[in-house]
Amino acid sequence: GPAALIEAASRPVDCVMAAIVGAAGLRPTFAAARAARRVALANKECLVSAGTVFMSAIKEAGAELLPVDSEHSAVHQSIADTDPRFIERIVLTGSGGPFRTWSAEQMAAATPEQAARHPNFSMGRKITVDSATLMNKCLELIEAFHLFPVAVDQLSVVVHPQQIVHGFVEFTDGSVIAQMGTPDMRTPIASSLAWPARMSAPATRLDLVRLGSLTFEAPDEQRFPALGLARRTLELGGTAGAILNAANEDAVDAFLERQIPFPAIAALAGAALEEGVRTGRVCEPACLDDVIAADEEGRALARGLLRRYS
C-alpha cells in the first residue's frame, strides 16, 4: 500500500525513478527526494502541483533531480553546464495530438476513442487525452519553469508532428542546441539513469535521410486553449497548479465516461482554476499537506462544475 511505497522510497539508494502517475506519487517521491542521491522524475504532479515545495525538498536534501519526460530531458541535455545568464529561451515540442488538423466543429464531436489515438506514442488513455487537448504541453511548461532557471516569458511550445526534435535551447549569442531522437521513451529513461555518462539503449536509431524533412508550426491557442492555462497558472503561483491539475484529471475522466464533450475538458479545468482564485483557495503552500489539500479542492471544484453537464 501507500505506506510501503513511502518506506521503499525512503531507503538510502543511489537513484530512485519516480514514475507513479497522479497525486498518489507525491508522498513517495518526496520521501525519495529526502533519501536518494538522485531522483529521476517522471511524475508530473511533483512539479505541476507542488513545484516550489518539491524543489525546496530537493535542495534541502542535496539530492540531484533529473527529468525523465522526453522534452525536459532534451532541454536538460541541451543546457548541460551552461551559465543560466546565457539562456535566452527554452522551447518544448509536441506532436499536436490526434486533432492537430481538426476544426473546432470537428473537435466538438470528438469521441474518447478518437482522442485516445496518439500519432506517435503508445500511452495510457488519460495522458493521450492530455496530448489531444494540449494540456500535456501546459503541464510541461509549468514543470519546465520549476526545472530550469528561466522566467515564464522565456518558455514556449512549437508543434512538431514528427517528434524527432524533443526540445531546444536558444542562447544569447543566437545559437540553438537541440536534442533529437526517435520518439522512444527508452532514450530519455537511459539518459536519466546514466547521466552524465551514456548507456546502451535499444531505441530505434535516427535516420535523417530516410525522414527527409522535419516540420514545425505554431500551436493554435484558439482551438487548443489549454496551452494558455500554463501562463495563468504560473502568474498565480502557489497552489494554482495543484487545482488546475486535479480539475483536469476529473474533467478527462468525465470526457472518457462521455459525460462532457471534448472542448469542455480545458474549459472546465480553467473554470475550476478561476473559481479557486475567486474563493481564495489559491495560496502559497507551506508543506506537502497543503498541496494535497489543494488537489482535493481542485477535484471538488471540478465536480461542482460537472453538475452543469448532468
What positions do the PLM features span?
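Catalytic, metal-anchored helix/loop core of enzyme active sites in primary metabolism
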Residues: 1-310
